[in-house]
Amino acid sequence: MTCLTRPLPNVVAILPAAGKGRRMQTTFPKQYLTIGNKTLLELTIYTLLRQPCISQIIVAISPDDYWFAQLPIAAEERVMVVTGGSKRVYSVMRALRYVKHVSWVLVHDAVRPCLHQEDLICLLTITAHSTVGGILATPVRDTIKRAGNIANVKTINYTVVRKDLWHALTPQLFMLELLKSCLQRALKEGVTVTDESAALEYCGYQPLLVPGRADNIKVTWPEDLQLASFYLSQLTNTHNK
């Protein structure tokens, strides 16, 4: 997709950051793991702050989170903190209550700090021609197997045809009122919402797929932290050239 060069509308970004991150095997939420002297959450926020059209970043944190207030970025003028919920979708819904004076809202994983500015701009420029929104995504490259279970042992059931399969990434960008209504309907009707685009799909919309870079990883497992550190070092080297 061609990234247009045009003035971008003001956008509010939401970071659901109330999760515990138990798969990281840490004693505190994974968004507060550090690379260098900054937490993953700070690195993610700073990436978004580089875009002037992002007028506000709303961070939804756990009610018992005492880490965020200790971070220097908590005093940043464009950063607002709200209390999140027990699931991602509840955190996003609570944050949406505070979105004012914009037509577009962007949702980004709190532990996805390796976002390239070029990808972010490409996503933001879909506001020129879409009335729904879209997500960053990458085509599936690896062979995908559907698992079976025999005597409590995982086995290969069959191979999934990967043509037209994409990995959903974040950020995900949608019209504010449309995202609100789709999330509300999905929750009311008991639909499991794993990301924001799933709610729009359920309501019959087809968000755009905006090709992004595969190094825009979400830190989920312990080994991801070292990989994210490497990717960020490459980003820093590129910016310093």
Curated annotation (Swiss-Prot):
This is 2-C-methyl-D-erythritol 4-phosphate cytidylyltransferase. One of its GO terms (biological process) is isopentenyl diphosphate biosynthetic process, methylerythritol 4-phosphate pathway. Catalyzes the formation of 4-diphosphocytidyl-2-C-methyl-D-erythritol from CTP and 2-C-methyl-D-erythritol 4-phosphate (MEP). NCBIfam families: ispD. The keyword Cell membrane does not apply. Keywords: Isoprene biosynthesis, Nucleotidyltransferase, Transferase. One of its GO terms (molecular function) is 2-C-methyl-D-erythritol 4-phosphate cytidylyltransferase activity. PROSITE patterns: ISPD (PS01295). CDD domains: CDP-ME_synthetase. It catalyses: 2-C-methyl-D-erythritol 4-phosphate + CTP + H(+) = 4-CDP-2-C-methyl-D-erythritol + diphosphate. The keyword Transferase applies. The record marks 162, 218 as: Positions MEP for the nucleophilic attack. It is an enzyme of class 2 (transferase). It comes from Baumannia cicadellinicola subsp. Homalodisca coagulata. Its EC number is 2.7.7.60. The record marks 23, 30 as: Transition state stabilizer. The gene is ispD. SUPFAM superfamilies: Nucleotide-diphospho-sugar transferases (SSF53448). Pathway: Isoprenoid biosynthesis; isopentenyl diphosphate biosynthesis via DXP pathway; isopentenyl diphosphate from 1-deoxy-D-xylulose 5-phosphate: step 2/6. Belongs to the IspD/TarI cytidylyltransferase family. IspD subfamily.
